[in-house]
């Protein structure tokens, strides 16, 4: 076989491979663009409010990039509302179950406006494991630009991250006292000289909105918020808690937790900003009860609790 023929064979093979990859990229890219458009349409058909601008495909040849302009998604009663100037979804042809998301100009409202956060830049990753286990990570990308619009007394956040896990596998039967958790989470926030870490899970039916009917259904069907660990560190204070929470008939927090603190004087001073009247002489380890619209530590009232929905 002559060298010229060998060269032609190699070149022809490379050209065919390149054409095949181009065809594959555009097939996967256009299919993904259609799936994103269809998903937004399904959200709208399900009763959510969805508005958006252009949906564009780019990224050839290395990545698949979907850009969505001016995306505004909220539940019907706006219990959850997210507005972004631009959201970008990034993946590759060979990793269809793993997406990286970058979002700019984010306005986020949670729990009927109980928490309203503005974040200039967010990044997230979406990965499906074994076909039915979803893991989502959202973080501030190290940028200290988070602003909590509703006053809370909290210092400005320098960085934060939220890890969510959901198992879509069907439950054959319930085992033990508690139902399988429908959502696992871990939240971490850094405010310079203070850190907050919150890990736990939620069981019961999923909340489709922050409304009386949805919360009542979640409560009546055994909904439970499990606090595996809540840890707050600032200066000489390290405050920890773990427990379980649900709602009473008037939609007020109901449950109990174990509390421990290294410095109750500092804890009493800082928590007074949130309306908690804690004794600076509390035991190093104590208990918290939430019942009948009251928060009690060792039987002493420290705060009144209102409903979680107006």
Language-model segments: what does each one mean?
Residues 1-7:
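N-terminal positive-inside, membrane-proximal cytosolic segments immediately preceding the first
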Residues 8-310:
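Glycine-rich, small/hydroxylated-residue low-complexity segments
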